Design a protein with these regions (language model features):
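Short, charged surface segments at domain edges that flank catalytic/cofactor-binding sites
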Residues: 1-37, 59-65, 156, 165, ...
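Catalytic cores of transferase enzymes with a strong primary signal for eukaryotic protein kinases
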Residues: 2, 36-38, 46, 71, ...
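Histidine-centered nuclease catalytic patch
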Residues: 19, 40-73, 81-101
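Phosphate-binding glycine-rich loops and adjacent basic patches that engage nucleotide phosphates
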Residues: 31-39, 123-128
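DNA major-groove recognition helix of helix-turn-helix/homeodomain DNA-binding modules
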Residues: 77
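Domain-level detector of nuclease and nuclease-like folds
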Residues: 82-172
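C-terminal, charged low-complexity interaction regions
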Residues: 130-223
Length: 223
């Protein structure tokens, strides 16, 4: 997960007599706020967008059209979360959700190699534990044929950027010739860009750098 800032003013479609949380102004505003990324898995630029209710509305019109309860999500994460997962971290609040939950992607893409989802640097809480359980399902669940396909595609996307990080790491730690300050600074900046909230799967790269003794010494704190 990644932290974002939600503006207090909400789209007009949520204040009219015929409220619509799927109206274009709502969807476009959420797309901008969340950098076109799923608020759970951090996939970016997916074609099938769902407007997710972090707190399931269960027919409650107040929750259904509450601006602060609407989140940008992919089909996979939205269907897995459903109405059963509650007490989920709100990435629009002050808590650094990327620090709360540690994530690591496997190097091999099959059902037997799981994404590691565990408690990060913050003290545990009901919300953190609930979100860990949900994210573990989002990244690893393959209980239907469609979820096997969507999970494989998701991991492939993560691994694409993971390869970029490993390439930068190699060039930074094992250069062909000694690095001067400018190219070294450029490589470090490339890694920091990957840790920005607008970058796909940014929480993975924060933890990859943080847990790498050599890389973290060069790059510094990325949280």
């Amino acid at each position: 997960m990644f932290s974002v800032i939600r503006p207090p003013t909400f789209p007009k479609s949520l204040s009219t007599s015929t409220k619509d949380y799927r109206a274009s102004d709502v969807v476009e505003e959420l797309q901008d706020i969340f950098f076109a990324k799923c608020y759970l898995c951090e996939r970016q630029g997916f074609p099938d967008v769902n407007i997710e209710h972090r707190d399931p509305h269960l027919g409650d019109s107040t929750k259904k059209f509450d601006w602060h309860n609407l989140f940008y999500a992919c089909v996979r994460c939205n269907s897995i979360k459903g109405d059963t997962h509650i007490n989920i971290l709100d990435c629009c609040q002050s808590i650094d959700v990327s620090q709360a939950i540690e994530l690591h992607c496997p190097a091999i893409n099959n059902e037997n190699h799981k994404v590691i989802v565990k408690l990060g640097n913050l003290p545990t809480s009901l919300e953190i534990e609930s979100t860990i359980q949900l994210l573990d399902r989002c990244f690893n669940e393959t209980n239907t044929s469609l979820r096997k396909i969507s999970r494989h595609s998701l991991i492939r996307d993560i691994q694409k950027y993971q390869k970029q990080l490993l390439n930068i790491r190699f060039n930074l730690l094992y250069p062909k010739r000694p690095l001067t300050q400018i190219p070294k600074h450029e490589l470090v900046n490339e890694l920091k860009v990957m840790c920005s909230p607008d970058f796909p799967f940014s929480a993975f790269w924060k933890w990859a750098i943080t847990r790498d003794a050599d890389l973290s010494r060069v790059v510094g704190n990325v949280f």
